[in-house]
Amino acid sequence: MAKKAILVITDGIGYSSGMEYNAFYNAQKPTYDKLFSNTPHSFIETHGLSVGLPEGQMGNSEVGHMSMGSGRVLYQDLVKISLSLSENRFRDNEAFRELLAKSSRLHLIGLMSDGGVHSHIDHFMGIADIAAKEGKEVFLHLITDGRDVSPTSAKKYLAQVEKHLGANIKIATVSGRFYSMDRDNRWERVQKGYEAIVKAEPKTTLNPSEYIDASYAKNETDEFIEPIAFDGYDGMSDNDSVLMINFRSDRMREITTAIGESNFSSFEKSDIKLHVATITEYDKNFSYPVLFKKDSPKNTLSEVISSAGLRQLHTAETEKYAHVTFFFNGGIDEPYENETRVLIPSPNVRTYDEKPQMSAKEVGEVVLKGMDEAYDFIVVNFANGDMVGHTGNLEAAKIAVNTVDSELGKILQKAKEMDYSVLITSDHGNCEEMRDDDGNILTNHTAGKVWCFVEAEGVSRVEDGGLNNIAPTILKLMGLEIPKEMDHSLV
């Protein structure tokens, strides 16, 4: 018979060696003090490659819960594409090969920066180099950023692009993201981007660097640079291939629709036949080939528990409800069989330092009731450490930690009485670094470690690991088989 287990996610509570501005270290936390003395615990990595993000990038709640719930490292699109290029696998991508085979001309359209939010310049240039080596004529349609990076950094990125130019690679157009990456159906903006990219209208005799300087002289920063085509580019032709290289979808849907959809009617467009592909899936209704399809992890923790015929309870307040349901279940909206979800409303305040307790008490009560109702598995998220950490208010963050500590105490006490194993960890840190060394307020997540405590019969040691090890550890505690797709248990 399966044993019962609880996973407590203390959102935004992590480890830092710094003490002065550490809300966790300075809070009243008798439950944690006992855990440190009496309970096996270890460190967990929550950022960078350990959760499928670029090296050094801080973790976030979405990837943290996906990693915990799936029991494996799910590489984010940016990393997946970067690895494909660095390991020389991109050139063999089936959809890419088919796109190259359709035309001698390839247009690459995307955001020219290293912001890593929508695109990466290394992807842009890496793909251009591969296509050029295959003998294709490559036209670059550079969208200037100025939002995820400095507002006047375009020339820095242009200098990187220019190192790759040659007989087969040319800059065709430049346009600010305000135009070519609109997402609010402001079609008059998109039209300007479209006309430069597809029709080569309007045109300038200036080179790209001179054109950017001229834009700055008119007080147009990178985001707002007017779309323009350069001498030597005469627009797209019938049967040209087009690859949209942004991996984030929301700001590429409109320009992709305008370029690729034959029944598009929001403005007048050219009647030419193009072969369009997208690097990731932008919209379920698009029929374009996709180079990197979304992974839907099979055999997640929730799925395995449901398949075993066991009952599970997922609960959090509003701020983290999607994380313990949709993200924890690997991007699945619908609950599994025998999965109950309980949403507790977050308090209606402007910022959570006004009420650092948030709705933790009510969330805790759902867990206690869940034990009374003999759920086999309970996952709960306490949002306080993260949401109050984001306000930058150290005193409020100490109250947030104390509140979570109090709820942990009640859960651990009852779990002992009801024979539940308990695993306590965090998706990422935040409140342990409220200011930097100079006393400046920090509101961001940290890129450090978090703790993993395991209160369970027969467990005397917990290995260090990552969030990908949490699901297999829960299954081990429950006496259920760990599926082959998952990584190893920490106990």
UniProtKB/Swiss-Prot annotation:
Residues annotated to bind substrate: H118, R147, D148, R177, R183, R248, S249, D250, R251, K320
Positions bound to Mn(2+) 1: D386, H390, H445
Keyword Isomerase: yes
UniProt cofactor(s): Mn(2+)
Residues annotated to bind Mn(2+) 2: D11, S61, D427, H428
CC terms in the record's Gene Ontology section: cytosol
Annotated catalysed reactions: (2R)-2-phosphoglycerate = (2R)-3-phosphoglycerate
Pathway in which the depicted protein is active: Carbohydrate degradation; glycolysis; pyruvate from D-glyceraldehyde 3-phosphate: step 3/5
CDD domains per record: iPGM
Broad enzyme group: isomerase
Any one GO molecular function term: phosphoglycerate mutase activity
InterPro entries per record: Alkaline_phosphatase_core_sf (IPR017850), BPG-indep_PGM_N (IPR011258), Metalloenzyme (IPR006124), PGAM_B_sf (IPR036646), Pgm_bpd_ind (IPR005995)
GO annotation terms (biological process): glucose catabolic process; glycolytic process
Cofactor note: Binds 2 manganese ions per subunit.
Residues annotated as the enzyme's active site: S61 (phosphoserine intermediate)
Keyword Cytoplasm (UniProt): no
HAMAP family attached to this UniProt entry: GpmI (MF_01038)
Function, as annotated: Catalyzes the interconversion of 2-phosphoglycerate and 3-phosphoglycerate.
Family that this chain belongs to: Belongs to the BPG-independent phosphoglycerate mutase family.
Name of the molecule in the record: 2,3-bisphosphoglycerate-independent phosphoglycerate mutase
Source organism per UniProt: Sulfurimonas denitrificans (strain ATCC 33889 / DSM 1251)
Lineage: Bacteria, Pseudomonadati, Campylobacterota, Epsilonproteobacteria, Campylobacterales
Gene name of the encoded protein: gpmI
